[in-house]
Amino acid sequence: LVWQSSSLAADAPMAAGTVKTSRGTAQIERQGAKLPADVGSAVKVNDRITTGADGAVGITLRDNTLLSAGPNSTLDLNKFAFNTTTHAGELNASVKRGTLAVVSGKIAKTSPENVSFNTPTISLGVRGTEFVIDAGKGVE
């Protein structure tokens, strides 16, 4: 029984990042559950991060990418993989509505072709280090 529970822990997906700042209404939607996006909360692949009219959330991914979602924003973390030794990896996120400020991390420096962000109307590849995405009211 002890072996089985440790096996389950090993199968749990590693966090892609951590909530570093949070204010107002901000939550993480994970597998149908709505969790508060409190400072220190894990952010995982397939999570949806949402903020209300008074909300904002700052996330640091494991490769040191910084994501800052403004009020009335919806962000889906579609893909994230990062090798801490080679700094190779992949990052894809969708900004469904609102704004997202990004300061790219190690993946974008090592493999910029593997970093992309989508909005309801456009797909963006990363070639710089800092940018802001404004998806407006977006489409859910």
Residue spans for each PLM region:
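Flexible, surface-exposed loop/linker segments and immediately adjacent secondary-structure boundaries
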Residues: 7-140
